[in-house]
């Protein structure tokens, strides 16, 4: 390659043939800029120290030499150079050919033209102009009156380019695993994905730190896994194993006013963190609540094998706990104040995947739940009653068995998470009796128990009389509620009567109203309440069974659907655990770490009173029950999957779902919200860390 390569304007290309023809082809662009730059500066590495080359067509830097442009013979006419250049460099999206950005130039002594590829020369020149802040760069530009070229904006401002604030890197022990192990583990596939998402931090979750948190309180505890980062979680579906560490960045929202310190410690695999100051006996580092810059910690991969399987949870754990309590010196009448800690993650340099698998292949372990609740409250339906959710009720104890599922896809109930008609065979208890029992069912999750059968029992012992309502009550008044069959569910029903004689009229299908509940039969006309459901405790009453047309019928095939409820008292349906039915055990949730369990409420229509309703308590949104039943999700038993609920007035609070499927909030009372509400996944946090909120709550001053 020649000693100097000069990119020339037409004013300097006097030795070239056919100057006029080239000018006609490229127009007045040529000659307006006289910029002399050494092509070494444009196309060759900065540290190149070779000053000459005796074989330019077998260049040592073939990739660089190729990027200069397309080679043409010195004797080719200019129009051929132009046409071949356009033909070999493609077309723009609108169909026009990619014309050369600059005229052809020559490498002295080679007798060849070089027409630069589109963008190559401009990219090189702009990169040099972009370094105009370097005083060592010298360029000569012919600034004629009609020449305007700007490489900067018109407005004032500094020349510094500011990147994302990375934060302070904290060095801690133990040292991450050697990269040689990673290389060996991924030897069959090599380095996997090397993309830009490996260089920046992605949001993981947010942790609330309040002035009520005592020393030793664990605010953040997560085991090393690809689930810590959204991009790693997505790519993990393509691989079977992984290895390597993860960088975690913490940003405290404090303004320099708060006082207090947090401790970060690495817990080795096989050790379970406990909420105690004794955890501070592990090697740890401290960071202050007044820290204005982010702090970065690395969770090292400590392992005894070459790689981890995707369901491996026995890994290194990063724990953030309170070292000194948070103090707000300006706190007065407020019971507490808090700040937020934002947690972001990115893979460390040694992180890699291995053992490729097809994306559709299912692994034994579960996935991280991100779609358990619909984003808009208009799509929320209760898992006890099929109407739309319209509120929340915080309780010290929440319970439900039927249609309630946990993160292991198990339920202690007898119904699937879908509202379907109940198909059963009914038979009279006795020839002269008023009640029917269920002798067979078409659809059942538990043998003998119809799918969708109600899960509450009657309040007291009940004797059938005439099966009708007490019409002396003209309007809804709890104090004078004398209706029969309190606690029964009103069922719309289509029956086919099994004939007991040759009377064909008895086989006709009829539409009628039935009453259904759970109870133990004392005699043919009396039932007692029970909180245990069996195939012998399913009670049905037909309001019209005393008529002469149906008195002879003893067996029916019935298809029923829920229509309403016969009111008991002012208590919501499902609020009394002694009246909630279960097969054996009743799943329950209690207050935990300052977080309170919550019921989802909706309305159930009560019988006889026109357009009257009562409240019904639900342990889950129906879609949550469906997702948990159909999928195996991964959530540690000591953690909450946190969603942020925002109403139309921008008030918000965090709602966490634990491993048992119950929901929690961090406030003891939820005020009236402006519906519709929106849900957004906020991440995973420890169950004992108080959930954040920003809602208007009533306060009492003593």
UniProtKB/Swiss-Prot annotation:
Keyword list, A-Z: Capsid protein, Host cytoplasm, T=3 icosahedral capsid protein, Virion
Site positions (Cleavage): 152-153
Tree of life domain: Viruses
Gene3D superfamilies associated with the record: 2.60.120.20
A cellular component term, taken from the record's GO annotations: T=3 icosahedral viral capsid
CDD domains named in the record: rhv_like (cd00205)
Family named by the database record: Belongs to the caliciviridae capsid protein family.
Assembly information from the UniProt record: Homodimer. Homomultimer. Interacts with the minor capsid protein VP2. May bind to VP3 and Vpg proteins.
Job description of the protein: Capsid protein self assembles to form an icosahedral capsid with a T=3 symmetry, about 38 nm in diameter, and consisting of 180 capsid proteins. A smaller form of capsid with a diameter of 23 nm might be capsid proteins assembled as icosahedron with T=1 symmetry. The capsid encapsulates the genomic RNA and is decorated with VP2 proteins.
Descriptive protein name: Capsid protein VP1
